[in-house]
Amino acid sequence: MAIPDEAGAGHRVHGMGLAMEAPTWPAITPEEAAAVLAHYPQAARIEALRWHSPRPFSAATLIDTTEGMLLVKRHDRRVRTAAGLAEEHRFIAHLAAAGAPVPEIWRTGEGESAVALGEATYEVHRQAPGDDLYRDRLSWTPFRSLAHAHAAGVSLARLHLASLGYGAPPRAVQPLVASFGILSATDPMAAAEAYVAARPALAAFLAGHAWRRRLSSLFAAWGEGLARHIAGQPPLWTHNDWHPSNLLWAADETVRTVFDFGLADRSCAAHDLAIAIERTAFAWLDLGEGHDDAIADPASALSLIAGYEAISPIDPAMMESIIAMLPLVHVEFALSEIDYFAGVVGDRDAGMLAWEGYLLGHADWFGSAAGRDFLAELRARRKL
């Protein structure tokens, strides 16, 4: 008897802008899901595929089995090998042991947390508790409310406490990781040179775009004293993609589960908080639409910070590090995204949008009057 797929027909995913697009990575099929779950002796019989994720960088589906719901996620092996997923899964296991509300990662009969089949790598999670209130929302879209921003700050602080003691080294070179080797360097331009040189597809893409001059200009504008600020922040493994769509929510508007650790790496708490603000306090998808001076929401950023401080104090040095990083905190992941578009997908237009609109455009906004006002308001409200 065929396994029903209730959402596979006409499946679309989020594009780089506001429009939905045909997926780069096709939806997982019932036959494919069955082949993956055959590696997990604890898996029960599949009843139906209920939902396919609209996220563009991988494919994922919620599967109804006779013993509950599972999430099966597929990655192209050029993006995540089994070893790359194991880096994430070891961090998640540490967080779970410390009491953090994270997904339960299933292991195969051989004890592995990922399965490699053909050109793909798969992971299987038990469906985590909580409502996926933001699952259809694009990245860089704000919280629904200041209460959600505050709750997200509380949850982030608790996650950072759970992360303490996890001493794994930084992740291996691979696409779509928010690593922390450029901003933390005493010479960020030299670190950027090394980053690009280690990624041939990225280097080839950037070759015609005067990238050294343009990055040097950004570091000159925003990098002074940055390494000194960061040097005082304790290293910590962090989530690095703190957006409400990566949180499952309880009925009382608190965070029930934290998921999607794909961008996680060793950085510091200030870096993770800066990313959280960059992801949630700006309507970046409206940038260039004629009202750039109105895309920022300092109240949301301050609510996030207040929630964090309800659990963990933010001293003046940490707060200054967060503010100093904000104009550049996206740079390393933007380069990683360009590497993905150039080296894995072969989508030059998306790569150009990531370079011009994301990496350069977001940083340039902070140099505008509205951007400088936003940073000044954070400082003033924090009495720095």
What does each of the following model-derived ranges do?
Residues 2-47:
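Juxta-kinase regulatory segment immediately upstream of eukaryotic protein kinase catalytic domains
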Residues 12, 142-207, 235:
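A cross-family kinase active-site recognition segment
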Residues 21, 332-384:
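ATP/Mg2+ or Mg2+-diphosphate-binding catalytic cores
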Residues 29-39, 168, 191-239, 381:
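An alpha-helical support segment within catalytic cores of ATP-dependent transferases
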Residues 56-66, 71-72, 105, 220-271:
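Active-site acidic catalytic loop and adjacent metal/ATP-binding pocket
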Residues 66-167:
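ATP-binding pocket architecture of kinase catalytic cores
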Residues 125-141, 195-200, 331-347:
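A glycine-centered beta->alpha junction motif in the catalytic cores
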Residues 270-312, 327-346:
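Active-site activation/catalytic loop segments of kinase-like enzymes and analogous catalytic loops
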